[in-house]
C-alpha cells in the first residue's frame, strides 16, 4: 500500500499548556474544523473527544496524552493533547519525546503559569520547535501583548506576534494576519464564515508597527533576508513566511498567534500556521541511537531505511494491550516479527491501529513519521525501541522522573488481593512514574507516584476498570540518604560452625559522588588479594544496602565507593560471604562519612487575592518554606516558594479555608535538600522504632 501523504506533508504536533489554558478545547475545535468530528465537544460538559477516560470527563482535566490523526490543506496532522496538571508530567514528557513540533497554549488572562514553565523546559530538553497560541481572548482581562512580554521575560523565548486580535474580551471580532497584512473578520458563531478584508483603519498604525518588528525579527534569523531588509526595509509575504519557518525549525523564533477556541475564533488560522511553520519529520534531525557494538548511529525519516520505532505509551484496552509507537524509519507491517532491542526479545505485530480518540482505524502498515498503536505486544514497555532483527539499534529513551510520594494500599476484602495485584501491575505497565513495591518490614503493598492527585486518580481507576476497592494509608514522603564526608569502611564476615566455614573481608574508600550519580563502584584491587569472582558479589552487597539505606531505611544516593583491599580464605570464602562483607563495609563506611537525610523540595506557586498575602506568606514560612519571589497584578498576588513536600499534605484544603475558596496553587518537584537536624532525628527514631 502506497503512502497516503508524502513525509513533507506530515506534521506530528503536541498541544501543551498549563491546566485550564484551554488546550483540550483547542484540540476539539481543530477536529471539528478539519472534519474528524461533526459536533463540538466541550470539556466542561464532559464531551471532549480526547478526554476518553471517565475521570477525565468528570474532572474536566486531561490525564493521558490522547493521540489523534486528522487532515488539513492536504496535510496529515497527528495531534497529541497533553495534560497540564503537574502530577501527570510523564504524559507531557513522553509526548515531547516523540513530537516534531508543539503548540504551547497560554491563557490570555493568566499568562505564563508555573506549569507552562515546566512544559517549556520539557520542550527545551528535546529541542522541539514550537509556536504559541494565546487562547481565551474573549475573557475579561485578556491582554495579548502582556502575555507576549511574559513569554519573552519568564521563558526567555524569542517570541514575536504574527497576528494581532481585533478587539478583546466580549468584542473580539477578528484577527489581523501580519504576514499577509490582512484582517480576518468572523461572521458567524461557529467560526466557519470568515471574511478576508483590509485591516480596519483604527488598527492600521499598530499593525504596521508590529509588522515592522516582525520583519526585523525574521531578518535577524537569516543573512540573506537581513541584506534585503537593510536595503529596502521591507520583506515580501513569501520572504516573511519562509523566514518564520526557518526561524521556527532552527529554534531561533517562536511565533505568537491568538484567538478564542471556545468562541470558535482563530483555530483555522492556527491550523494554517501548523502546516506553514511547524516541521515535517524530514525537517528535524534524524533520531540517534546505539548499535550493538556501542557506536552511535542515526535513522533517517525514510520508508526505505531500516525499520525503527519508539514505544512511548502502553495502555490497557478492552481488546488487549495497546502500545503507542512513533515510527522513525522504515515500514512496520501487520503480521511481521520485530525485535525489542531494549530487552533483546522478539515481538509479533498482530494488529496496527491509527487512533481518532474513541474511534480507531485498522491499517496494514505504519510508515516513517507515523504515530500509531500496536495491539498485542507482550514484553514492550514505555521507552523501549522496536526495530528490524537484521539491523538492530537502541534509540534514545525517555527521561522518567522519580516518584516523590508513596502510600500503603490494601484491598477492602481479603479475597480481592489477587485482583489488586493484577490492577497494580497493569497500571504500572502504563505509567512509568507509578511504582509498586512491598515494604519488607510490614509486608504492605506500597504505591508511589508524582503527587496526591496522581495516586488518587490511579486508585479511582482500580475501582472503575478493575472493580477493586482499596484502603489507602497516609501519604509518605520519599526521603533519600547521602553522605557529606569521606572515610574508609571495613567489613569482615567470618563464621565457623563445624565443617566448611564462611569468610569474606572487604575494605573500601567512600566519598560523596557527583549530584545525580546514584551509586558508583570502582574496583582498585590489584595483585589478586581478592579473587575476581568475589568482586561482583561484594559490589552487589553494597548496592543492595545502598538501595535499602543505612540510617533510616531510605535509598542512599550520590555515593562513590572504591574497593581497595580485603582478604580471602582458600576453603571458606564464598560469593555469599563476600556479599555480606561488602554490605558490612558499606554500612561501616556510611556511619563514618557524616550521613544525612534528604527530603524532596517542591516548587510551590500560590495565587491569591492581595488581602490574603500576609497570611499565606506566614503559613508557608510555618511549613519550613522559603519565599523566593512575589508579584502583584490586577489585585492578585503570586507567591513563589520552595517548601518541603512533607509539609504540603492537605495544603489544598488549608488554602481554601484561609482564602475563602479564592486561592489556587500549583506544586512540582524541584530538588532534594538536607533535612534540618531536629526534623531528621524525629524521622530516624520513628523509622528505627518501626523496624
UniProtKB/Swiss-Prot annotation:
Q: Name one GO cellular component term.
A: cytoplasm
Name the UniProt record assigns to this protein? Elongation factor G
Q: Please report the stretch or stretches of sequence annotated as the tr-type G domain.
A: 8-282
This chain's source organism reads Prochlorococcus marinus (strain MIT 9313)
Source domain of life is Bacteria
Q: Which GO terms describe its molecular function?
A: GTP binding; GTPase activity; translation elongation factor activity
- Report keywords, A-Z: Cytoplasm, Elongation factor, GTP-binding, Nucleotide-binding, Protein biosynthesis
Q: Which Gene3D superfamilies match?
A: 3.30.230.10, 3.30.70.240, Elongation Factor G (Translational Gtpase), domain 3, P-loop containing nucleotide triphosphate hydrolases, Translation factors
Q: Where in the cell is it found?
A: Cytoplasm
Per the record, the major location class is: cytoplasm
Family listed: Belongs to the TRAFAC class translation factor GTPase superfamily. Classic translation factor GTPase family. EF-G/EF-2 subfamily.
Q: Name one GO biological process term.
A: ribosome disassembly
Write one Pfam family the protein is assigned to: GTP_EFTU
Residues that bind GTP: 17-24, 81-85, 135-138
Protein task = Catalyzes the GTP-dependent ribosomal translocation step during translation elongation. During this step, the ribosome changes from the pre-translocational (PRE) to the post-translocational (POST) state as the newly formed A-site-bound peptidyl-tRNA and P-site-bound deacylated tRNA move to the P and E sites, respectively. Catalyzes the coordinated movement of the two tRNA molecules, the mRNA and conformational changes in the ribosome.
- Asked whether the keyword GTP-binding is assigned, the reply is yes
Amino acid at each position: 500500500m502506497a503512502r497516503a501523504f508524502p513525509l513533507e506533508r506530515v506534521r506530528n504536533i503536541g498541544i501543551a499548556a498549563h491546566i485550564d489554558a484551554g488546550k483540550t478545547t483547542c484540540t476539539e475545535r481543530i477536529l471539528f474544523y478539519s472534519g474528524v468530528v461533526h459536533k463540538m465537544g466541550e470539556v466542561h460538559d464532559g464531551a471532549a473527544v480526547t478526554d476518553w477516560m471517565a475521570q477525565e470527563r468528570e474532572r474536566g482535566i486531561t490525564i493521558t496524552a490522547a493521540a489523534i490523526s486528522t487532515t488539513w490543506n492536504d496535510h496529515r496532522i497527528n495531534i497529541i493533547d497533553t495534560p497540564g496538571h503537574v502530577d501527570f508530567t510523564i504524559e507531557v514528557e513522553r509526548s515531547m519525546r516523540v513530537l516534531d513540533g508543539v503548540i504551547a497554549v497560554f491563557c490570555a488572562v493568566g499568562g505564563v503559569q508555573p506549569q507552562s514553565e515546566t512544559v517549556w523546559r520539557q520542550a527545551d530538553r528535546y529541542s522541539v520547535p514550537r509556536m504559541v497560541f494565546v487562547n481565551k481572548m474573549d475573557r475579561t482581562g485578556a491582554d495579548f501583548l502582556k502575555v507576549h512580554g511574559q513569554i519573552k521575560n519568564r521563558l526567555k523565548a524569542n517570541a514575536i506576534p504574527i497576528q494581532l486580535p481585533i478587539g478583546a474580551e466580549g468584542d473580539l471580532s477578528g484577527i489581523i494576519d501580519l504576514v499577509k497584512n490582512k484582517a480576518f473578520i468572523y461572521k458567524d458563531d461557529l467560526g466557519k464564515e470568515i471574511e478576508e478584508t483590509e485591516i480596519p483603519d483604527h488598527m492600521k498604525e499598530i499593525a504596521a508597527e508590529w509588522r515592522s518588528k516582525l520583519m526585523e525579527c525574521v531578518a535577524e534569523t537569516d543573512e540573506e533576508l537581513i541584506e534585503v531588509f537593510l536595503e529596502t526595509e521591507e520583506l515580501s509575504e513569501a520572504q516573511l513566511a519562509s523566514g518564520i519557518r526557518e526561524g521556527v525549525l532552527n529554534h531561533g523564533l517562536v511565533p505568537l498567534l491568538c484567538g478564542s477556541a471556545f468562541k470558535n475564533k482563530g483555530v483555522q488560522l492556527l491550523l494554517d500556521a501548523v502546516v506553514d511553520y511547524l516541521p515535517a519529520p524530514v525537517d528535524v534531525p534524524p533520531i540517534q541511537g546505539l548499535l550493538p557494538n556501542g557506536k552511535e548511529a542515526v535513522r533517517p525519516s525514510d520508508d526505505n531505511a531500516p525499520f525503527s520505532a519508539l514505544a512511548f505509551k502502553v495502555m490497557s484496552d478492552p481488546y488487549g494491550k495497546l502500545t503507542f509507537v512513533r515510527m522513525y524509519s522504515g515500514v512496520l507491517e501487520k503480521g511481521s516479527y520485530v525485535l525489542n532491542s531494549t530487552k533483546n526479545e522478539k515481538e509479533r505485530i498482530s494488529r496496527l491501529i491509527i487512533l481518532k480518540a474513541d474511534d480507531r482505524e485498522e491499517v496494514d502498515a505504519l510508515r516513517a513519521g507515523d504515530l500509531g498503536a500496536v495491539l498485542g505486544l507482550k514484553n514492550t514497555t514505555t521507552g523501549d525501541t522496536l526495530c528490524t532483527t537484521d539491523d538492530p539499534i537502541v534509540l534514545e529513551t525517555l527521561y522518567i522522573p522519580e516518584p516523590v510520594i508513596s502510600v500503603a494500599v490494601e484491598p477492602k476484602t481479603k479475597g480481592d488481593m489477587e485482583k489488586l495485584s493484577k490492577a497494580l501491575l497493569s497500571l504500572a505497565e502504563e505509567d512509568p512514574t507509578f511504582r509498586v513495591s512491598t515494604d519488607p518490614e510490614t509486608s504492605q503493598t506500597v504505591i508511589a507516584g508524582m503527587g496526591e492527585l496522581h495516586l488518587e486518580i490511579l486508585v479511582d481507576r482500580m475501582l472503575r476498570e478493575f472493580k477493586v476497592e482499596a484502603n489507602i494509608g497516609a501519604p509518605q514522603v520519599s526521603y533519600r540518604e547521602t553522605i557529606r564526608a569521606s572515610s574508609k569502611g571495613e567489613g569482615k564476615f567470618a563464621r565457623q560452625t563445624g565443617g566448611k566455614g564462611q569468610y569474606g573481608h572487604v575494605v573500601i574508600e567512600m566519598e560523596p559522588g557527583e549530584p545525580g550519580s546514584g551509586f558508583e563502584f570502582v574496583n582498585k584491587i590489584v595483585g589478586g588479594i581478592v579473587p575476581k569472582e568475589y568482586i561482583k558479589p561484594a559490589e552487589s552487597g553494597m548496592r543492595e544496602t545502598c538501595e535499602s539505606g543505612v540510617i533510616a531505611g531510605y535509598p542512599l544516593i550520590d555515593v562513590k565507593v572504591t574497593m581497595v583491599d580485603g582478604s580471602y580464605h582458600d576453603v571458606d570464602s564464598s560469593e555469599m560471604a563476600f556479599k555480606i562483607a561488602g554490605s558490612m563495609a558499606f554500612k561501616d563506611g556510611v556511619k563514618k562519612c557524616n550521613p544525612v537525610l534528604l527530603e524532596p523540595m517542591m516548587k510551590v506557586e500560590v495565587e491569591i487575592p492581595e488581602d490574603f498575602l500576609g497570611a499565606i506568606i506566614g503559613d508557608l514560612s510555618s511549613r519550613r518554606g522559603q519565599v523566593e519571589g512575589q508579584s502583584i497584578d490586577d489585585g492578585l498576588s503570586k507567591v513563589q516558594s520552595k517548601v518541603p513536600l512533607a509539609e504540603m499534605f492537605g495544603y489544598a484544603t488549608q488554602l481554601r479555608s484561609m482564602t475563602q475558596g479564592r486561592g489556587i496553587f500549583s506544586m512540582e518537584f524541584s530538588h532534594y535538600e538536607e533535612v534540618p537536624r531536629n526534623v531528621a532525628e524525629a524521622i530516624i527514631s520513628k523509622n528505627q522504632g518501626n523496624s
